[in-house]
């Protein structure tokens, strides 16, 4: 007696993201996203794939190219299940950049590539360049920021907190 399992799905399981994406939206918004997801998931397999996108766009009178569909699919780091769908929309709607973009922006001012920036230097940058912060805004930022006893702002940890929330004290 052979115990071969029938292969019903060839999709690999999406990587689990430690994300508080469900906390970003209220219950009615999540329900609306679920309805939108189900409308796009034409074959009802719980994932949005290239064919689902094609069928959905075709139903809207569009004729997307394969390259266009491929570019859309490549915005996700893996298969698009509902959590991934919500995460992608959450980032777009929240207006926050992806984690690596934020980290790289800080890294421009980290000449020694230590993952930290001296807090006084960062304050100067934030209050004199670009969309200038007030001193009060910098103080507010520093209140919960990962700054060591030497006054080094850990932008790698800060970026992680910004995108995923603070670690629990037990971690």
From Swiss-Prot:
Keyword Calcium appears in the UniProt entry: yes
Residue numbers bearing the Phosphoserine modification: 19
SUPFAM superfamilies: EF-hand
Entries under Pfam families matching the protein: EF-hand_11 (PF08976), EF-hand_7 (PF13499)
Recorded GO CC terms: apical part of cell; brush border; cell cortex; cytoplasm; myofibril; myosin II complex; stress fiber; Z disc
GO biological process, one term: regulation of cell shape
Record's comment on post-translational modification: Phosphorylation increases the actin-activated myosin ATPase activity and thereby regulates the contractile activity. It is required to generate the driving force in the migration of the cells but not necessary for localization of myosin-2 at the leading edge. Phosphorylation is reduced following epigallocatechin-3-O-gallate treatment.
Further remarks about this protein from its record: This chain binds calcium.
Function recorded in the entry: Myosin regulatory subunit that plays an important role in regulation of both smooth muscle and nonmuscle cell contractile activity via its phosphorylation. Phosphorylation triggers actin polymerization in vascular smooth muscle. Implicated in cytokinesis, receptor capping, and cell locomotion.
Binding partners and assembly: Myosin is a hexamer of 2 heavy chains and 4 light chains: interacts with myosin heavy chain MYO19.
Name this polypeptide is given: Myosin regulatory light chain 12B
Gene: MYL12B
């Amino acid at each position: 007696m052979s115990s071969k399992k029938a292969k019903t799905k060839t999709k690999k399981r999406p990587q689990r993201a430690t994300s508080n994406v469900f906390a970003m939206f209220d219950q009615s918004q999540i329900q609306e996203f679920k309805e939108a997801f189900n409308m796009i998931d034409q074959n009802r397999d719980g994932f949005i794939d290239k064919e689902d996108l094609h069928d959905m766009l075709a139903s809207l009178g569009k004729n997307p190219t394969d390259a266009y569909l491929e570019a859309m699919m490549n915005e996700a780091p893996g298969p698009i299940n509902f959590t991934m769908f919500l995460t992608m929309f959450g980032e777009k709607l929240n207006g926050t950049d992806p984690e690596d973009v934020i980290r790289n922006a800080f890294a421009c001012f980290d000449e020694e590539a230590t993952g930290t920036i001296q807090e006084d230097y960062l304050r100067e940058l934030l209050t004199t360049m670009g969309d200038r912060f007030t001193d009060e805004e910098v103080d507010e930022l520093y209140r919960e920021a990962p700054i060591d006893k030497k006054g080094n702002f850990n932008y790698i940890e800060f970026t992680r907190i910004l995108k995923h929330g603070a670690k629990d004290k037990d971690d």
